[in-house]
């Protein structure tokens, strides 16, 4: 990163921006891979902003670090957990994924679990719905991805 978490937080002071903002953090890949990300999140939360972090939910060490933030900050944090069901199942990471989702929920964060649908999941729909209901008490959301780099926003 070109700037420290503290510098970024200083630039994003809510007084400079006219009040608290909703800030979405989405990486070009897994958002939480950089080891510094929890500190960027922390510093922005300290400014009084609301953050939404898009993540695949698999980096337990990052969630462990974030879980140590004060609850009043965590209540301003929402995770959009991308639910890559087939890949998580193939790697045997479904338990890890749901454990991280529940950990953040128990610490006071808001969340969504969002399945990216594709034809290869048709036979698994009932299993996916039942798994989410069993683990989280509700079915996951469906998010249709679009290629924003194309004029027609292809699926």
Please place each PLM-identified region on the residue numbering.
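Well-ordered, non-membrane alpha-helical segments in soluble/globular domains
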Residues: 2-11, 38-39, 63-66, 91-101, ...
């Amino acid at each position: 990163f070109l700037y420290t978490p503290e510098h970024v937080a200083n630039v994003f002071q809510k007084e400079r921006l006219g009040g608290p903002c909703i800030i979405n953090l989405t990486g070009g890949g897994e958002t939480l891979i950089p080891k510094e990300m929890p500190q960027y999140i922390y510093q922005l939360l300290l400014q009084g902003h609301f953050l939404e972090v898009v993540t695949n939910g698999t980096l337990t060490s990052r969630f462990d670090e974030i879980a140590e933030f004060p609850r009043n900050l965590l209540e301003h944090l929402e995770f959009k957990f991308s639910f890559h069901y087939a890949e998580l199942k193939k790697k045997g990471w479904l338990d890890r994924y749901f454990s991280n989702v529940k950990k953040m929920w128990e610490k006071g964060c808001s969340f969504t679990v969002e399945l990216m649908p594709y034809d290869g999941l048709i036979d698994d729909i009932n299993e996916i719905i039942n798994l989410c209901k069993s683990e989280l008490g509700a079915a996951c959301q469906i998010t249709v991805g679009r290629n924003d780099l194309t004029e027609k926003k292809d699926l």
